[in-house]
Amino acid sequence: IRDRSSGTAIEQACTVLASAIDNAESVALVHNASQMRKDAADSCGSDSLREVLETNVVAINTINQRLIPLLPRDSSILYVGSTLAEKAVPGSFSYVTSKHAQLGMMRATCQDLMGTGRHTAMICPGFTDTEMLRTHLGNDPAVEKMIADMNSFKRLIEPAEIAELIRWAHHNPVINGAVLHANLGQKES
Protein backbone atom coordinates (compact mmCIF):
# COMPACT_ATOMS: atom_id res chain seq x y z
CA ILE A 1 0.00 0.00 0.00
CA ARG A 2 1.72 3.15 -1.17
CA ASP A 3 -0.34 5.70 0.79
CA ARG A 4 -1.36 4.25 4.13
CA SER A 5 -3.01 7.54 5.06
CA SER A 6 -5.54 7.12 2.23
CA GLY A 7 -8.59 5.10 3.20
CA THR A 8 -9.31 4.50 -0.48
CA ALA A 9 -5.81 3.14 -1.17
CA ILE A 10 -6.02 0.86 1.87
CA GLU A 11 -9.45 -0.41 0.84
CA GLN A 12 -8.28 -1.11 -2.72
CA ALA A 13 -5.22 -2.97 -1.47
CA CYS A 14 -7.31 -5.00 0.98
CA THR A 15 -9.61 -6.05 -1.86
CA VAL A 16 -6.63 -7.34 -3.85
CA LEU A 17 -5.14 -9.03 -0.80
CA ALA A 18 -8.46 -10.63 0.15
CA SER A 19 -8.58 -12.49 -3.16
CA ALA A 20 -5.00 -13.72 -2.63
CA ILE A 21 -5.81 -14.87 0.91
CA ASP A 22 -8.83 -16.80 -0.36
CA ASN A 23 -6.69 -19.65 -1.73
CA ALA A 24 -3.86 -19.54 0.81
CA GLU A 25 -3.12 -22.22 3.38
CA SER A 26 -1.14 -19.81 5.56
CA VAL A 27 -0.62 -16.05 5.42
CA ALA A 28 1.90 -13.76 7.09
CA LEU A 29 0.26 -10.36 7.44
CA VAL A 30 3.25 -8.09 8.10
CA HIS A 31 2.74 -4.51 9.26
CA ASN A 32 5.98 -2.76 8.32
CA ALA A 33 5.18 0.70 6.93
CA SER A 34 5.93 3.64 9.21
CA GLN A 35 6.63 7.33 9.17
CA MET A 36 9.49 8.69 11.25
CA ARG A 37 9.79 12.40 11.81
CA LYS A 38 12.17 14.53 13.83
CA ASP A 39 9.93 16.02 16.50
CA ALA A 40 9.67 16.50 20.25
CA ALA A 41 6.98 16.43 22.92
CA ASP A 42 7.01 20.20 23.30
CA SER A 43 6.91 21.00 19.59
CA CYS A 44 5.10 18.20 17.73
CA GLY A 45 2.01 19.73 16.19
CA SER A 46 -1.22 17.81 16.59
CA ASP A 47 -1.74 17.63 12.83
CA SER A 48 1.73 16.13 12.38
CA LEU A 49 1.12 13.60 15.17
CA ARG A 50 -2.25 12.74 13.62
CA GLU A 51 -0.58 12.07 10.24
CA VAL A 52 2.00 9.75 11.80
CA LEU A 53 -0.66 7.91 13.80
CA GLU A 54 -2.79 7.57 10.67
CA THR A 55 0.03 5.73 8.89
CA ASN A 56 1.60 3.90 11.82
CA VAL A 57 -1.50 2.91 13.81
CA VAL A 58 -4.88 3.62 12.19
CA ALA A 59 -3.93 2.04 8.84
CA ILE A 60 -2.90 -1.14 10.66
CA ASN A 61 -6.26 -1.22 12.39
CA THR A 62 -8.10 -0.79 9.10
CA ILE A 63 -6.09 -3.57 7.44
CA ASN A 64 -6.59 -5.87 10.43
CA GLN A 65 -10.36 -5.31 10.42
CA ARG A 66 -10.57 -6.26 6.77
CA LEU A 67 -8.06 -9.11 6.59
CA ILE A 68 -7.85 -10.90 9.95
CA PRO A 69 -11.31 -12.47 9.56
CA LEU A 70 -10.12 -13.94 6.23
CA LEU A 71 -6.84 -15.40 7.50
CA PRO A 72 -6.74 -19.21 7.63
CA ARG A 73 -5.45 -21.13 10.63
CA ASP A 74 -1.65 -21.20 10.82
CA SER A 75 -1.46 -17.56 9.74
CA SER A 76 0.32 -14.76 11.56
CA ILE A 77 -0.10 -11.04 12.14
CA LEU A 78 3.40 -9.63 12.56
CA TYR A 79 4.10 -6.08 13.63
CA VAL A 80 7.48 -4.56 12.80
CA GLY A 81 8.16 -2.33 15.75
CA SER A 82 11.47 -0.88 16.81
CA THR A 83 13.67 -0.81 19.85
CA LEU A 84 11.66 2.38 20.39
CA ALA A 85 8.49 0.34 20.98
CA GLU A 86 9.66 -0.15 24.56
CA LYS A 87 11.84 2.87 25.23
CA ALA A 88 12.35 6.39 23.92
CA VAL A 89 15.02 8.74 22.65
CA PRO A 90 14.84 12.50 22.18
CA GLY A 91 13.76 13.89 18.84
CA SER A 92 11.41 11.06 17.81
CA PHE A 93 8.24 11.85 19.74
CA SER A 94 5.58 10.83 17.20
CA TYR A 95 7.48 7.72 16.08
CA VAL A 96 8.03 6.52 19.66
CA THR A 97 4.37 7.19 20.49
CA SER A 98 3.19 5.21 17.46
CA LYS A 99 5.54 2.27 18.09
CA HIS A 100 4.32 2.03 21.69
CA ALA A 101 0.78 1.97 20.29
CA GLN A 102 1.71 -0.82 17.87
CA LEU A 103 3.04 -2.87 20.79
CA GLY A 104 -0.31 -2.47 22.51
CA MET A 105 -2.07 -3.50 19.30
CA MET A 106 0.03 -6.66 19.07
CA ARG A 107 -0.66 -7.61 22.69
CA ALA A 108 -4.39 -7.01 22.26
CA THR A 109 -4.34 -8.97 18.98
CA CYS A 110 -2.78 -11.90 20.83
CA GLN A 111 -5.58 -11.90 23.39
CA ASP A 112 -8.36 -11.40 20.84
CA LEU A 113 -7.17 -14.26 18.61
CA MET A 114 -6.92 -16.90 21.35
CA GLY A 115 -8.04 -20.27 20.05
CA THR A 116 -8.15 -19.26 16.38
CA GLY A 117 -4.92 -20.98 15.33
CA ARG A 118 -3.43 -17.64 14.29
CA HIS A 119 -0.57 -15.97 16.11
CA THR A 120 1.06 -12.58 16.45
CA ALA A 121 4.35 -11.06 17.51
CA MET A 122 6.30 -7.85 17.30
CA ILE A 123 9.72 -7.83 15.71
CA CYS A 124 11.76 -4.90 17.05
CA PRO A 125 14.75 -4.12 14.85
CA GLY A 126 17.58 -2.02 16.12
CA PHE A 127 19.51 0.30 13.84
CA THR A 128 18.83 -1.18 10.40
CA ASP A 129 20.49 0.00 7.20
CA THR A 130 17.41 1.52 5.59
CA GLU A 131 16.61 4.71 3.75
CA MET A 132 14.44 5.78 6.70
CA LEU A 133 17.34 5.50 9.16
CA ARG A 134 19.85 7.17 6.85
CA THR A 135 17.44 10.06 6.23
CA HIS A 136 16.78 10.40 9.96
CA LEU A 137 20.55 10.56 10.56
CA GLY A 138 20.98 13.20 7.86
CA ASN A 139 22.92 10.83 5.57
CA ASP A 140 26.00 11.61 7.65
CA PRO A 141 28.60 8.78 7.57
CA ALA A 142 30.10 9.91 10.89
CA VAL A 143 26.71 9.70 12.61
CA GLU A 144 26.03 6.33 10.95
CA LYS A 145 29.33 4.99 12.33
CA MET A 146 28.52 6.33 15.79
CA ILE A 147 25.12 4.58 15.65
CA ALA A 148 26.66 1.34 14.37
CA ASP A 149 29.15 1.42 17.25
CA MET A 150 26.21 1.28 19.68
CA ASN A 151 25.84 -2.50 19.35
CA SER A 152 28.16 -5.39 20.10
CA PHE A 153 28.86 -6.08 16.40
CA LYS A 154 29.69 -2.45 15.51
CA ARG A 155 27.56 -2.46 12.36
CA LEU A 156 24.09 -1.67 11.13
CA ILE A 157 21.62 -4.53 10.82
CA GLU A 158 20.98 -5.72 7.28
CA PRO A 159 17.33 -5.65 6.13
CA ALA A 160 17.69 -9.32 5.07
CA GLU A 161 18.39 -10.24 8.70
CA ILE A 162 15.08 -8.72 9.77
CA ALA A 163 13.28 -10.40 6.85
CA GLU A 164 14.61 -13.78 7.96
CA LEU A 165 13.41 -13.16 11.53
CA ILE A 166 9.96 -12.23 10.21
CA ARG A 167 9.87 -15.45 8.17
CA TRP A 168 10.92 -17.44 11.23
CA ALA A 169 8.30 -15.75 13.43
CA HIS A 170 5.59 -16.64 10.93
CA HIS A 171 6.51 -20.33 11.05
CA ASN A 172 6.84 -20.56 14.84
CA PRO A 173 3.55 -19.90 16.67
CA VAL A 174 5.27 -20.69 19.97
CA ILE A 175 6.25 -17.00 20.04
CA ASN A 176 2.60 -15.84 20.08
CA GLY A 177 2.45 -12.50 21.89
CA ALA A 178 6.23 -12.12 22.09
CA VAL A 179 8.38 -9.07 21.49
CA LEU A 180 11.46 -10.15 19.53
CA HIS A 181 14.34 -7.70 19.78
CA ALA A 182 16.76 -7.86 16.85
CA ASN A 183 19.35 -5.25 17.71
CA LEU A 184 22.76 -7.00 17.76
CA GLY A 185 23.00 -6.39 21.50
CA GLN A 186 22.30 -2.68 21.55
CA LYS A 187 24.30 -0.74 24.14
CA GLU A 188 22.12 0.83 26.82
CA SER A 189 23.02 4.22 28.19
Each predicted region: which residue ranges?
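Substrate-binding pocket helix/loop in short-chain dehydrogenase/reductase
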Residues: 40-50, 147
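Rossmann-fold cofactor-recognition segment
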Residues: 1-8
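Short, small/polar-rich loop/turn modules that mediate ligand/substrate recognition or access, typified
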Residues: 114, 119, 174-178
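A glycine/serine/threonine-rich, flexible loop-to-helix segment
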Residues: 115, 127-150
